[in-house]
C-alpha cells in the first residue's frame, strides 16, 4: 500500500504568518508551526512522487531521510507550489525527474 507523507500543511504564507497576532500564529505549540503544503507518496517498489515543491522544499527534505524522487506532480503554478523547484537539483543529479 502506498504511504503518504505530509511535508507541509500550512497556508500559502506558512504558519505562523508574518505579522499575524491570531491565537494560532502566536501559539507556542509545535503543531502550530507549519510549512507550506507538500507531500510525498512512496510506493512499495520504492518509487516516490513529490506533490508540489514550494519555497519550503529544502527545509522539508532536510527533515526526512534522503531518497530519490521519481516524479513531481504540480497541482498548480502558484509560487507556494513551485518556488522550490531549483532545490530539486540534488535529486536530479545524473538522473531525470518527470514533471
Give residue ranges: language-model regions.
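Conserved beta-strand hairpin/beta-sheet module of binuclear metal-dependent hydrolase folds
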Residues: 2-63
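Active-site metal-binding motif and surrounding structural segment of the metallo-beta-lactamase
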Residues: 46-99
Amino acid at each position: 500500500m502506498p504511504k503518504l507523507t505530509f511535508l507541509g500543511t500550512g497556508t500559502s504564507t506558512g504558519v505562523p504568518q508574518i505579522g499575524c497576532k491570531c491565537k494560532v500564529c502566536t501559539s507556542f505549540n509545535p503543531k502550530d508551526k507549519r510549512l507550506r503544503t507538500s507531500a510525498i507518496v512512496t510506493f512499495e517498489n520504492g518509487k516516490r512522487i513529490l506533490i508540489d515543491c514550494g519555497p519550503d522544499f529544502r527545509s522539508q527534505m532536510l527533515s526526512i531521510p534522503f531518497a530519490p524522487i521519481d516524479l513531481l506532480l504540480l497541482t498548480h503554478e502558484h509560487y507556494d507550489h513551485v518556488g522550490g523547484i531549483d532545490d530539486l537539483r540534488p535529486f536530479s543529479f545524473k538522473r531525470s525527474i518527470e514533471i
